[in-house]
């Protein structure tokens, strides 16, 4: 299968430095996710959920989600939260990004789909939903031929056909919801 190299900005998406993986945002998100999924106290879970929902609305959520999505050494729920954050940010906060940053986001999400081509499927689905929502909001000049491009990128190898099918499944759902 054809390898797609990481975009040059992939590790520095939206100005994220190498130190981002140890930033207070990443640490805070990881702590809140730990509380949400593993703390037996219902009030702690509620507070963690509220903190995470508020965090997803911030501009910093773009780079933090990117850092966590790339980190293979963090728990699945952290990477899933990152993929869900991208979906939420694309749906509600895309205006926080200029046109060129939207193209970088597209390339970042495509590269992430390459990384997660063999699973976990729940992350693939969230990334496909984010890409479908992004495709609907980007101009054709910025991202023309969405479906043929996805077929070309993910349709040529058995290991990535599942990603293509997932995208082609969620795209019409996103169209009908928007």
For each feature predicted by the language model, list its residue ranges.
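Karyopherin-beta/Importin-beta family HEAT-repeat alpha-solenoid scaffold
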Residues: 13-178
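Short, Lys/Arg-enriched N-terminal segments with co-localized hydrophobic residues
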Residues: 1-15
């Amino acid at each position: 299968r054809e390898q797609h190299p990481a975009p040059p900005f992939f590790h520095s998406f939206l100005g994220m430095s190498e130190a981002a993986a140890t930033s207070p945002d990443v640490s805070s998100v990881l702590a809140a996710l730990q509380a949400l999924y593993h703390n037996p106290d219902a009030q702690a879970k509620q507070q963690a959920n509220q903190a995470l929902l508020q965090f997803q609305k911030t501009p910093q959520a773009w780079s933090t989600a990117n850092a966590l999505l790339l980190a293979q050494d963090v728990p699945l729920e952290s990477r899933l939260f990152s993929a869900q954050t991208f979906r939420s940010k694309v749906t509600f906060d895309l205006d926080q990004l200029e046109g060129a940053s939207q193209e970088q986001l597209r390339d970042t999400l495509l590269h992430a789909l390459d990384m997660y081509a063999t699973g976990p499927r729940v992350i693939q689905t969230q990334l496909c939903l984010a890409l479908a929502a992004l495709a609907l909001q980007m101009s054709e000049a910025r991202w023309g031929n969405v479906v043929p491009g996805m077929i070309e990128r993910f349709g040529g190898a058995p290991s990535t056909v599942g990603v293509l099918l997932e995208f082609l499944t969620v795209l019409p759902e996103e169209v009908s919801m928007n």
